Amino acid sequence: MPSVFWILFDGGGDRPVGGRTPFHTAFKPTIDYLTSLGSCGILDPIAPGVRPGSDTAHLALFGYDPYKYYTGRGAFEALGAGLELKPGDVAFRTNLATIDDNGMVLDRRAGRYITPEEVEAVENLMANIAEDIKRKYGVEIIYKSTVEHRGVLVLRGSVSHKVSDTDPHKVGAKLLESRPLENSKEAVLTAEVINEVTKRFSEVAKDLEINRKRRLEGRLPINAILLRGGGYMPQIEPVRERYNIKAAAIAGVALIRGVARAVGMDVYTARGLGGTKDDMFDEAVRLAVELMGRYDLVFLHVKGTDSASHDGDFKGKVSVIERLDKALTPYLDKLLNNYVVITSDHATPISIKEHTGESVPILLYGPDVVTDDVSKFSELTCWRGALGRIRGIDVMPILGSYLALTEKFGE
């Protein structure tokens, strides 16, 4: 029985620059060959004009209405980092950042690259802060770094997710204080704890040895931690029960691993798949092809296209697409006997470096899928395809139908 190999270019959708997008520019003979044999269309990850986060977009793509199941990004980040959340836990997504003496954010990613030595120093600092917070407030803190500047912070105790972010979400704005968003003692306590953590981190981090070295090397210091996306673990029916599909996900990013875990997918990672625009995909594709013999659906997440977009790096985005295509080439014969889906979770145009709400291209190839006249995978061409315009939440039912795994509606 054939399986589905689903390739997701995070933030892959784009707007034309000089009449061309990264998908249109990239030399990707394998993807374009599959395109010439399959059905193309355009996909609204959530709905037309809605600017999706990667979390809400992936929930929708995995077949779950984000308006019903989304409880904040932090819980997914924590799951993806390998943490087990207990009932009542509140998790936040974190960024290591750089601020000036007045608390203005200079870089929300502290230059993005964080060495293992720096990660260890930050985790040690957070462990010390956690001890003080536990004594003072009775709230347990668990911090874990994930990829580059990213991390997760879990609060355990009499806490609430009903608090505001400390991340201003833009450079040149002041680091925010968290505020309770409801009149409860749990929300008030949570905001107080977050503000104490934020304050203590900046006070101590500025004098760390790692920052002395970073300054000598001309790198930005790590002197702030930004929190956002507080949430708790939602109750979600596993994808195996909801769609009768046994699924696996391969991802190097904690968020995507977390969403996949939350919906009951088995989660894998692969050498070279670190969640950056420099990732190499040979091992990830090899693993995906191997897993296709054991799963109905194998999902491969490619983060580098989004990272390049946020950096405004057109050539870098093209390079990510081309490296993935090259990794597919040795397995073309295998792919031709199975189903292949290629799409994005949202557009992140190079020109604005942020998520936008336009539709993205989608390809569905399979031995028994109708072939249309589209021969190049791109925003400029896929709209002409036989698949038409669909929503993210439509993808899993469509795949379940081709796999003959979903139940018939009615008699």
UniProtKB/Swiss-Prot annotation:
Alphabetically ordered keywords of this record: Glycolysis, Isomerase
Catalytic class of the enzyme: isomerase
A biological process term (GO) from this entry: glycolytic process
EC number assigned by the record: 5.4.2.12
InterPro entries: Alkaline_phosphatase_core_sf, ApgAM_prokaryotes, Metalloenzyme, Pglycerate_mutase_ApgM, Pglycerate_mutase_ApgM_sf
Function: Catalyzes the interconversion of 2-phosphoglycerate and 3-phosphoglycerate.
Protein name per its UniProtKB record: 2,3-bisphosphoglycerate-independent phosphoglycerate mutase
Name of the gene encoding the protein in the UniProt record: apgM
